[in-house]
């Protein structure tokens, strides 16, 4: 999508933050006349940026013990969140893990 938008001066695209490297981010508002907010780690995690979402992983505690639980715990660890940041997403603050 980014390549298609780059070819058209009038195009607008929407995608995940990890896919937005090298593109111009624009401020958006929840309503007409409302404050336009630029996407950033701070505005996304605070909920101020109006078109962001969390990604969830659902597991069954009774069925997904062991390796799955270890993986989820690693994802929520500082090491796992470092990988999240390395691939272009915003890591969760410790109080949200």
Regions picked out by a protein language model, each given a short descriptive name:
Residues 1-97:
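Exported/periplasmic ABC-transporter solute-binding proteins
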């Amino acid at each position: 999508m980014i390549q298609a938008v780059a070819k058209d001066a009038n195009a607008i695209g929407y995608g995940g933050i990890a896919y937005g490297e090298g593109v111009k981010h624009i401020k958006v508002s929840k309503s007409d006349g409302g404050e336009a907010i630029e996407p950033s780690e701070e505005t996304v995690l605070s909920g101020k940026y109006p078109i962001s979402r969390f990604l969830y992983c659902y597991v069954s505690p009774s069925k997904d013990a062991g390796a799955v639980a270890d993986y989820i715990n690693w994802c929520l660890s500082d090491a796992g969140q470092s990988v999240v940041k390395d691939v272009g997403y915003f890591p969760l603050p410790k109080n949200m893990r």
